[in-house]
Amino acid sequence: TTAAQTTTTGNGAPTPGETVKIGVVSPQTGGLAMYGVVDTWWVDHATKALGDGIVGADGKLHPIQIVVRDSQSDSNRAAQVAGDMIQNDGCHMILAGGTPDTIDPAADQAEAFETPFLSNLSPYQPFYFGRQKDPANPQPFKWTYGLLLGTEQAMHIFVEVYKDIETNKKVGMLFANDTDAQGWLDEKTGAPVVLKEYGYEMILPSLYQPGAEDFTEQISMFKKEGVEILCGTNNPAELTNFWKQALQQGFHPKIASSGKALGYVSTLEAIGEIAYGFLGEGVWHPTWPFKDTLTGMTCQELADEYEAFTGDMWTAAMASYSKFEWAIDIFKRAADPMDKETVVEAIKTTNLTTMQGPINFTEPVDPKGWHPNENVYKQLFCAVQWRKGTKYMFEPVIVGNAEATMVTIQGKIEPMQYS
């Protein structure tokens, strides 16, 4: 890449450029509000790191304004605030992260209003295939991109760990009737493909309604079928209710894994000591060997800063910040940061290593590789087991690195213990 040509004023400072506005769709309230806490941290961190702004490829100093709007953990509201930030606030780019419920409706608005959009920490299947007019014949989107996880990656890291414990290979799937489940259970690209490949049997009860409080039907089926491995992606309240009922009703799997809810220690604390041994998705960890591109801070230093800022234990969802690192890299490289077309061209040529790992859109598209389609690069991923901690009640130990081989494994999986 060529260095930016800097235009300067008489005193040697770069010529002032227009303000770049970046809109953030954030679940500040509602069922996903734990993601909102992370957004509040990284917006503060980024604002301090950026100071007066960035020098773009046009040589001008562009101040960065971050606009945050609450999605209220609601998909309709996520779409509304994304549209408002584009039309009323004049945002040049929209960011969203966490789950398909927050990301996908916001992405549809960005596509409709022809505004660059970045996302992370969510499955790419609903983001890419779920938003197609004709899912059987998917076409690239022009404006919307993500550093996203594949449900096949999640299943891969889990089965690589499952095999370390002797079981009957019966996996009970616990999912709500939502877009997450559609991605996970996709017969062509989701969990069924990986389970079959590794010789596991999938036991799938009916999908529960989001926010359900009674899981008797699912538990009964798991017991009847002799399920020894639990796998799901659930909201915190759902998982808490399910697990307490499961133990009351005598369902004791050797392995229990869940996505989404276990990104936060608060979920485990709400369940209590009966949650020791749960297997979760490690989308980030303080021991990862990467640095923040804005400050040069290590992952451990970022975790320490987060704990000082919030008073809470660090969370893997801190990786939500990486999409902002990506956004800044794009605006620095775009020929004209104020021209959406050149911003999109800069997205397509991204080759950056963030605090969450690499994003390389210059790699050839390969459905089975890290760049599975034009709009997605896959994130790194490890399996963590939540154990009794030294500093905190629960601490995640990395037990599998099949989708992040440069990450150090900290221990072997242990079976769930029941008193």
Language-model features, listed with the residues they occupy:
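Hydrophobic alpha-helical
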Residues: 100-111, 213-214, 227-249, 323-328
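Extracytoplasmic ligand/sensor domains, especially the bilobed periplasmic-binding protein
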Residues: 91-205, 254-280
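Segments of small-molecule ligand-sensing domains
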Residues: 305-317, 328-395
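Extracellular/periplasmic periplasmic-binding protein-like sensory domains
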Residues: 149, 246-321, 333-334, 399-404, ...
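Beta-alpha junction/loop-to-helix N-cap segments that form part of ligand/metal-binding clefts
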Residues: 10-14, 34-41, 53-133, 147, ...
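Short, low-complexity disordered leader/linker segments with a strong preference
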Residues: 1-21, 57-58, 86, 416-419
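Extracytoplasmic "Venus flytrap"
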Residues: 14-16, 20-46, 69-75, 98-100, ...
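Surface-exposed patches in mature extracellular/periplasmic domains of secreted proteins
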Residues: 56-64, 96-97, 173-176, 312-320, ...
